[in-house]
Amino acid sequence: MSTVNELVNRVDETYDVLQIEKEIGLDNIALSDLELLATGGYSPLTGFLGKKDYDSVVETLRLANGSVWSIPITLPVTEEVAETLKVGEEVKLVNGGNVYGVIQIEDIFVPDKEKEALLVYKTTDEAHPGVKKLYERPNVYVGGAIVLTKRFENNPFPSYHLDPIETREEFKKRGWKTVVGFQTRNPVHRAHEYIQKSALEIVDGLFLNPLVGETKSDDIPADVRMESYEVLLQNYYPKDRVFLSVFPAAMRYAGPREAIFHALVRKNFGCTHFIVGRDHAGVGDYYGTYEAQEIFTNFTVEELGITPLFFEHSFYCTKCEAMASTKTCPHGKEDHVILSGTKVRELLRNGEIPPSTFSRKEVVEVLIKGLKKEVVTE
């Protein structure tokens, strides 16, 4: 493991993989993890977790060396594949017939998945999408340092797909000393906009970093979301104060733990601050509304290396005639229009147009067009 402030770089496209015979097939989650490990997005990790680090992360939200890390980044293989592997071997990492990297095997172990589910997701309920995915993936984990030997082709968002070293450079070029990161898997609605702009009042720049890796089936597709972010930024944000780039990771839906993970990753991308709103990275009713904020009290800002900014649930108040939160609005619930990505999705899928208090009209137009296309292709 590298030191906390150092950006890991394990990309080497000249690496000779021809002599390596054995291979491990990567699913989409492991493939996106491979890229983020190699480009420093997951610094200080240099590879998939071995047993010692895995146990430590699951039980204590820290690596074995004490560094804060809250989500186990693992490489699952089947029992059949595991039987062919040995510690000390170098093995190719493949997906769709392409070799994307290699792993130097340091560990092969069988995890206690029920324990992982309970501690990471706070539930063993298979209706939870993160738990479901955990149980679906193979049952043996392979740990070890990796090298990314081939960059991904057919990247759906090439102009927005930047490595941490590139986003850091971009912020520097813009003269931003303080940058706030915002994680989203939903189209940006008015409550998000209010929070982002409130944060923008106290920092130099906003880094809008939507997740475009694997998400659950009823989330709005990434290409539709990206178009919605583009029209929003074009029409309602100062161009020199906002930067848009994608986060290629898969969504874990691990609530509080994922909030810590998202903050650590944005630190690697160059952020000094990170927005944590209500039910960050949550799903259903598995986590408390502000549980993802409360978990940060277990860590100092120094050891995280990034400052979390906590925001209460915001809403449109018909009496204030403005976006507000309980901190700024004295009126009762009957005057509050509660906004959420789930509600916007629900309205759109029912063929209803969300009111302007929910979403900007340009965003709604993009979403309607995108969802019509989705219906046609289903």
From Swiss-Prot:
Signal peptide stretch: none
Protein's GO biological process: hydrogen sulfide biosynthetic process; sulfate assimilation
Pathway: Sulfur metabolism; hydrogen sulfide biosynthesis; sulfite from sulfate: step 1/3
Pfam (any one): ATP-sulfurylase
Enzyme Commission number: 2.7.7.4
Origin: domain of life: Bacteria
UniProt KW Nucleotide-binding keyword: yes
InterPro entries found in the cross-reference section: ATP-Sase_PUA-like_dom, PUA-like_sf, Rossmann-like_a/b/a_fold, SO4_adenylyltransferase_pro, Sulfurylase_cat_dom, Sulphate_adenylyltransferase
Recorded catalytic activity of this chain's protein: sulfate + ATP + H(+) = adenosine 5'-phosphosulfate + diphosphate
Keywords for the protein's UniProt record, in alphabetical order: ATP-binding, Nucleotide-binding, Nucleotidyltransferase, Transferase
Keyword ATP-binding: yes
GO molecular function, one term: sulfate adenylyltransferase (ATP) activity
Membership in a protein family: Belongs to the sulfate adenylyltransferase family.
Protein name stated in the entry: Sulfate adenylyltransferase
Gene that encodes it: sat
